[in-house]
């Protein structure tokens, strides 16, 4: 992990390679989706109802990924769960990721209800970014992740209900 330029307070522009790995892990369901030959795939075939929300969602989601990889705390190391707070939020991030994977398992198994999609597939990825932000003391990621959660939820729910 490297720090190149101080942004503000204890936040630096840098590079955290595990951020890239954590992003890739969260994307595994999309990588394996073609192997399942789904009869229906509402997540990938939604009718777009709001161009503005679509753009906001894409910008915020991409920003979460960039912030996770390129913003690091002054005292951060490559990987640490030494403090109680770090252990808690790392455990939350792992739990959220596992719930997301559970939801994808339901989805791939044919349970494609709006409830399953919204709870496990839509809500969990932004919460994953928020938990990682809290774990890594990355205030920008945490804040953008919360906004992404709201926009992502409203956008996908509106599309699924169309």
Name what the model sees in each region.
Residues 6, 10-76:
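Selected alpha-helical membrane-embedding segments in polytopic membrane proteins
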Residues 66-98:
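Helix-adjacent hinge/juxtasegments
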Residues 99-100, 122-132, 148-152:
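Hydrophobic, membrane-inserted alpha-helices
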Residues 105-116, 127-142:
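Membrane-helix boundary connector in multi-pass membrane proteins
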Residues 8-11, 74-85, 134-140:
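Membrane-interface helix-boundary motifs at transmembrane edges
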